[in-house]
């Protein structure tokens, strides 16, 4: 469907923060094997990163976000939370500044 096609397009064209965070998630032993995937549709929404085994979604918040985008992100958070997902919002600017620090914070949320 259209959501799946959009997810594929987004996977092919990651933002700088997505690229940096994905590399960090793949290379950091604390997250390896935890089942994280990139740009995955869940219902009508596309998640930036999700781990189905952990029921954890990482949502990147862009530096400049329109009111519409913020509203959509809030709706996505409600939708996912209602379905038992833990949604971690991460500022893209923080990923670009210090991905290691962001991973430490995520690890605290995700657990061992």
Tell me the role of every PLM-derived stretch:
Residues 1-34, 111-112:
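Solvent-exposed, charged helical/coil patches
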Residues 38, 42-110:
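Basic, amphipathic alpha-helical patches used to engage nucleic acids or provide basic targeting signals
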């Amino acid at each position: 469907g259209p959501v799946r096609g959009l997810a594929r397009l987004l996977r092919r064209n990651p933002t700088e923060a997505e690229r940096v965070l994905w590399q960090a998630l793949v290379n950091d032993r604390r997250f390896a094997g935890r089942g994280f995937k990139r740009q995955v549709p869940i219902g009508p929404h596309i998640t930036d990163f999700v781990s189905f085994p952990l029921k954890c979604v990482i949502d990147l918040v862009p530096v400049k976000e329109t009111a519409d985008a913020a509203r959509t992100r809030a709706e996505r958070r409600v939708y996912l939370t209602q379905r038992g997902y833990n949604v971690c919002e991460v500022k893209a600017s923080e990923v670009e500044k210090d991905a290691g620090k962001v991973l430490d914070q995520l690890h605290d949320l995700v657990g061992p």
